[in-house]
Regions:
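Glycosyltransferase-associated regions of secretory-pathway enzymes
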Residues: 2-168
Length: 168
């Protein structure tokens, strides 16, 4: 992505081989799954089979359906699903999947996009400033409200709103 700022050398990561990073972290007792985001930083090696698999996947996709509905699935979702099929585990640790090193959120994405709080650690190499230009106005407003009043209260208010107006 163009909104990524490199703050620390990545020589050790690059020397290790192909890599990508996660844009989220797992919360104790939570139900989230890792989301691997190539836009945070992507290191490749020649003839990496995973790249061919991704190209083959995209070659068969349609991004506009009959009736002009759009395929809204992101590269993060496609990448994560393919990595899960190849052995990605739902853990907050460095792991090697199909010759690709997958790094936890703290390495390439230290900002929590919901709260805008940054948690730079000794492992952080870059910062994804997360413009979220693809998100709808409603989704952007939810992020802004969550930053002001907190994610839990935003979730409660969102559920109440859906109950009142009858939307899922």
């Amino acid at each position: 992505d163009t909104d990524v700022e490199v703050i620390k050398p990545m020589n050790d990561i690059i020397e290790r081989g192909a890599f990508m990073g996660c844009e989220n972290e797992l919360k104790p007792g939570g139900t989230s799954i890792l989301a691997v985001a190539p836009g945070l930083g992507l290191g490749c090696i020649p003839r990496l089979g995973f790249n061919e698999d991704m190209l083959n996947l995209y070659a068969g996709l349609h991004f506009q359906y009959a009736g002009n509905d759009l395929n809204q699935k992101t590269v993060v979702e496609y990448t994560t699903e393919l990595l899960v099929a190849k052995g990605l585990r739902n853990i907050d640790d460095i792991q090697c999947v199909n010759e690709i090193w997958i790094y936890p959120k703290e390495y390439f994405c230290p900002i929590d996009y919901r709260t805008n709080k940054m948690n730079v650690t000794c492992n952080t190499r870059s910062i994804h400033h997360f413009a979220a230009s693809w998100k709808s106005w409603d989704e952007k407003m939810k992020i802004i409200i969550a930053r002001i009043i907190g994610t839990k209260l935003t979730h409660i208010l969102g559920n109440a709103r859906r109950c009142i107006i009858g939307k899922k």
